[in-house]
Curated annotation (Swiss-Prot):
GO terms for cellular component: fungal-type vacuole; Sec61 translocon complex. SUPFAM superfamilies: Preprotein translocase SecY subunit. The chain crosses the membrane at residues 34-54, 77-97, 120-140, 147-167, 247-267, 362-382, 416-434, 441-458. GO terms for biological process: misfolded protein transport; post-translational protein targeting to membrane, translocation; retrograde protein transport, ER to cytosol; SRP-dependent cotranslational protein targeting to membrane, translocation. Belongs to the SecY/SEC61-alpha family. Keywords: Endoplasmic reticulum, Membrane, Protein transport, Translocation, Transmembrane, Transmembrane helix, Transport. Coiled coil: none annotated. It comes from Neurospora crassa (strain ATCC 24698 / 74-OR23-1A / CBS 708.71 / DSM 1257 / FGSC 987). Its main location: endoplasmic reticulum. Heterotrimeric complex composed of SEC61-alpha, SEC61-beta and SEC61-gamma. This is Protein transport protein SEC61 subunit alpha. GO terms for molecular function: peptide transmembrane transporter activity; protein transmembrane transporter activity; protein-transporting ATPase activity; ribosome binding; signal sequence binding. The keyword rRNA-binding does not apply. It is a multi-pass membrane protein.
């Protein structure tokens, strides 16, 4: 009699979980574009649809640091964003990668149970997170809202979370391009960047009305100010609002990431089954893609959240103050760290602040580079892309490294892959730091995530066969 596995506990829930059926035939590229566009439209509508029953508040957002990375929008149906999906996915990938759960992803039955377990855990996280948000007073004191509104708020968040899970599954199963997670993150970040560049919203800063969008502000200042030189300077360097230098910095980061995406080490391989058949196995500079910055951002965001919650309740406690002291930014209700451990984990506000506090800048750079390098090296072990995994994949395909026997192939890959992962992770961290210091729109982390995801989508589209000519033209 075989022992009961963890995944077997999921079987009773399979009939009750909604599921997107696997397509019976290959979906044409144009239909994939249509489904991807429809998914995106639903996400955008949900991002703007306010929750019914909330008490509006201009107080500091304790989840501010997580919003962009988690495709979340405060006070809307997309309040939870992709948090339940990404948290569930990372937990199960960690459990499978460290063999804490018994699963063979080569078997269809195990693969389906594994995906169902991920979905079930994401639903549980949605219910738990929604309940915590409502009962901790994020939308107003529960006693003021009443039992009916409290239940309605939780229901709205859980149903919206379920829709997001199904939209992600729709794309993952081949009806669309890529995954819902990547699509929603990139859309959220690009929407933020475009808004900061072209927003027509007028803000009174004490010097008269100014437009929030950097490009709109440039034309407005040139048309309304007599001194054109001063108008240009103001448009390029104005404080507390997006400026042209921020926009140019964003474009520089976009170009740098796309350029570095092309860096790779080509490992020559040959077939052990067909004489004369040769090829190459590419090891990219960004071997783990954007995972290091996502994991680092998730770590920092959660540390910031805990510190902010502790400081709001125990602001006089010495240990809490050593952890982090929070004060409101000038002209906003949003809190930012001004001292303590979390201050050194957060980026300088701008290049001037970086020069004025070199210790903060040095510690932040060291933290970013180290965290991204460590996360990148760790991720290859749990994601099925370690030297041992790659050696097994090559062996299964009947390939060996040119000049190496099967037995020595693992040693050579062990010399190359961890180094590439750590160096690539550090490069991602360095780009994020540079992006933050230059003041790129949408934060350094957000800009990097957007570029790597968009580049990934471009590659997916190219693989579909419709954009091969375009790719060749752009890549030269």
């Amino acid at each position: 009699m075989s022992s009961l596995r963890f995944l077997d506990l999921v079987k009773p829930f399979v009939p009750f979980l909604p599921e997107v059926q696997q397509p019976e035939t290959k979906i044409p590229f144009n239909q994939k574009l249509m489904w991807t566009g429809l998914t995106l439209l639903i996400f955008l509508v949900m991002s703007q649809m306010p929750l019914y029953g909330i008490v509006s508040s201009d107080t500091s957002d304790p989840l501010y640091w997580l919003r962009m990375m988690m495709a979340s929008n405060r006070g809307t149906l997309m309040e939870l964003g992709i948090t339940p999906i990404i948290s569930s996915g990372m937990v199960f990938q960690l459990l499978a990668g460290t063999h804490m759960i018994d699963v063979n992803l080569d078997l269809k039955a195990d693969r389906e149970l594994y995906q169902t377990a991920q979905k079930l855990f994401a639903v549980i996280l949605s219910i738990g997170t929604a309940t915590v948000y409502v009962f901790t007073g994020l939308y107003g004191p529960p006693s003021d809202l009443g039992a009916g509104i409290v239940f309605l708020l939780i229901l709205q968040l859980v149903v919206a979370g379920m829709i997001v899970i199904l939209l992600d599954e729709l794309l993952q199963k081949g009806y669309g391009l890529g995954s819902g997670i990547s699509l929603f993150i990139a859309t959220n970040i690009c929407e933020s960047i475009m808004w900061k560049a072209f927003s027509p919203t007028s803000i009174n800063t004490g010097r008269g009305p100014e437009y929030e969008g950097a490009v709109i502000a440039l034309f407005h200042l040139l048309m309304t100010w007599d001194n054109k030189q001063r108008a240009l300077y103001e448009a390029f360097y104005r404080q507390n609002l997006p400026n042209i230098m921020n926009l140019l910095a964003t474009l520089v980061v976009f170009a740098a990431v796309i350029y570095l995406q092309g860096f790779r080490v080509e490992i020559p391989v040959k077939s052990s089954r067909q004489r004369g058949a040769r090829g190459s196995y590419p090891i990219r500079l960004f071997y783990t893609s954007n995972m290091p910055i996502m994991l680092q951002s998730a770590l920092s965001s959660n540390v910031f959240l805990i510190s902010q919650m502790l400081y709001s309740r125990f602001s006089e406690n010495l240990l809490v103050r050593l952890f982090g002291v929070w004060e409101a930014k000038e002209g906003t209700a949003q809190l930012s760290a001004v001292s303590g451990l979390v201050y050194y984990m957060s980026p300088p506000l701008n290049f001037k602040d970086a020069l004025l506090d070199p210790i903060h800048t040095a510690v932040y750079i060291a933290y970013m580079l180290t965290a991204c390098a460590v996360f990148s090296k760790t991720w290859i072990e749990v994601s099925g892309s370690s030297p041992r995994d790659v050696a097994k994949q090559l062996k299964d395909q009947g390939l060996v490294m040119a000049g190496h026997r099967e037995q020595s192939m693992y040693k050579e890959l062990k010399r190359i892959i961890p180094t590439a992962a750590a160096f690539g992770g550090a490069c991602i961290g360095a780009l994020s730091v540079a992006s933050d210091l230059m003041g790129a729109l949408g934060s350094g982390t957000g800009t990097l995530l957007a570029v790597t995801i968009i580049y990934g989508y471009f590659e997916i589209a190219a693989k579909e066969g419709d954009l091969q000519g375009m790719k060749g033209m752009i890549m030269g």
